[in-house]
Amino acid sequence: MAATPESLQARKTRLLSVVRKIKSVALDPLADQVFGLLRSNPVCNKRVLTKYARVVKDPDPIATTQLLMGQKYPILAKEKYLHHFTPEERAANFAEEEDCRRPGWKRCTRKALNLWLDKEIEPNEETKQVIKVLYENSFDLVRDYLSHSWDRAIIRYGIVPKERQVVATRKVLVDVPKEYRQKAVVEIIQPGFNLNQPEVKIYVEKIMEKIGHKMVLGMSIVDQARVLLNSLDPKMRMLPVAVTLHDNLAQHSISYYGNNWMVHHLPGRVYDTPGDTNDLREACSLIMREVLKVKPEKRRDHLLHLRKGPQGLLEVLQETKENYPVKVIKSLLGLPCSKSHDYFGTQMIIEAAVEESRLVTSGGGVSWREYTGIERIHFRHDDVRGWYTHDGPLIKEIVFSRTERKTFTKLLVNIANYIHYDWAARPAKTAKEMRRLTMEEVMLSPWSFLGATRGIWQEFWARLDSSYFPTSEEIRNYLQMGDGEIKIRCVLETEVPGDTSVYYRVTDEGALVEVGGSSRIPKIESLPKRSSKTLDGTWNSNDMTFIPILHPTVCLPRTIEFHYSRPDLLSDIQCFNFSNYNQHCPYLLPANERASFCNTARMMLYGASTQVRRWPKVYLAYLYCFAGFHETPTVSKLHRTRFLTYDEIDLYAQRGVFKHNPENDTWLIFNKEWVGLNDPFQFPGLLVSSALLGYRLENVTHAGKRKREDDLMDLKDGMKELESKMDGSSVYV
């Protein structure tokens, strides 16, 4: 908004008033002290004065530089370095008075710079450290470029498909989202400035681990903050980049390819690999499965109880490449996610999603949500880029960059499945079978999906393979497949929107809808099967939502600890409620001995139910972990078995993964002492014989199961009655 004439006149009046006051000070006896104070304290009103008194943006910097270099004193030098020059050199090359715009500096000639270089004065260590910090990124770029054997590189000639995309032109110290960079730097310079912001603390800790020498003496706080802030800025730029170029090479992109050539297999080239990113993404799929079972309002609290080593889940997600489960967990935690999402190898970006939708169910019982209305979706698939529009299951238009026929056909398969093409008419009973049938149809006759004929399809690819692109006044640089209702065009180059991050909310159906926006990420119907059904041993939690999926060596101690801390444990044992929060523990045992082992644990709890105060609570919690298994045992009196492949597990707590040390009355779990527990313990063998072996007793007086007493019988008749019934049957005695 332009300033009004009145405001400009007011500024001018204030400026002239200040100038008159400064001029009047020159007549004061203490004028030197006043001017010295103004020069040494360039803040507050003087800063405001400077803002309004000078032009910040030079309209023609080249002309200004040429004008300055033509003057007698075009350069400024600090006064403290003048002692390196002789009096004759100072008189010939330096102005007598200091520069009126910068206190402590003097104007000098261009020859003074050459004299300084000829003296070859060795900078002190403090100056060297400052130079190292200021030019560290440039040093790294040069070091990286010269570390490779360019003379041994393989160059391939041909068309280099390119796309305009936002890429990082500089490697950052720590990957910090833009909205947190300034806050993190302020927190480092002024600890405690950002209160109640755990996200900032996460990045501050990472920066402090790597900051090393970046905070040096000899630099002002403002300069150090600027250097630190620059080291966190990847300098994202929109550039035409080769489609197949690795992200880490964007800073040297001009050295890796041209219009018709590209470097391959450069010796010494080391790429940043995702490390255990795949493991983290698999872990997130397992975490997502469990947390979605919880009420929506409690999901975030449960996730915050999960840790991986010393890191919380918030920190772990910062290092994890996004897929659907990662996006879901990030959204539940209130973190931003990328609009781009993977659909079986194709990156999709829905810029503006349609709002109207309906739930569709096929004849085989497969249900999905179908969005009606024209919707444009951008895509990336291998080396092909472009976009397509669709209306529900009908494709309307496809625009794609130059690629091979095989790659384009695979892309069509994913597009067809993404928009649920012809799913309503398919007889499949699962989403996986639907995708398989769609793939077979599109791979067999892709032209049918595009509304064309086989002849048009063959002619199009023959012309494309011959590198023929028609050029006219109206149409340039694209090749169209036929003249049907569905527009299919191949272009030389295309653009995909930059990868932006937004906030999503998770719907009841599992889809992600942008908060305050119009983009959408649909639920992925099927996720890759995990090789393991549990997390690795570095994950930990005290929340029963995630304890069942922890590594067995972590799961068992955490389950015992959970029941030990649960106030209802003793009342559950006395009321014979043996199935609370322990359904996962029996599956840590061998399948053929699982039922018998758990039945023994249940019988021992029956025996202890009348004297729960006599037995250590940690031991009762241990027995309770295995007392809720529902299957009828085929082997009797099994109190010891294998705990997966780790060690034995003994209900008597005499050996194996959980045992009692009688010498000092301590408890050991995986040979580690349970700190704080020193309860006396006696041999529990008599508990096994305290109830009917091979039978399961249930208290039904409080459960409301028994409505009448005409089918009630005594114990002897009940046992005889069960002999003629199938396993798992029950009678009331």
Swiss-Prot record:
Q: Which of UniProt's keywords are assigned here?
A: Cap snatching, mRNA capping, mRNA processing
Q: What does this protein do?
A: subunit of the RNA-dependent RNA polymerase which is responsible for replication and transcription of virus RNA segments. The transcription of viral mRNAs occurs by a unique mechanism called cap-snatching. 5' methylated caps of cellular mRNAs are cleaved after 10-13 nucleotides by PA. In turn, these short capped RNAs are used as primers by PB1 for transcription of viral mRNAs. During virus replication, PB1 initiates RNA synthesis and copy vRNA into complementary RNA (cRNA) which in turn serves as a template for the production of more vRNAs.
Domain of life from the UniProt record? Viruses
**Protein name from the UniProt record:** Polymerase basic protein 2
> Assembly state and interactors?
RNA polymerase is composed of three subunits: PA, PB1 and PB2.
Listed GO biological process terms:
7-methylguanosine mRNA capping; cap snatching
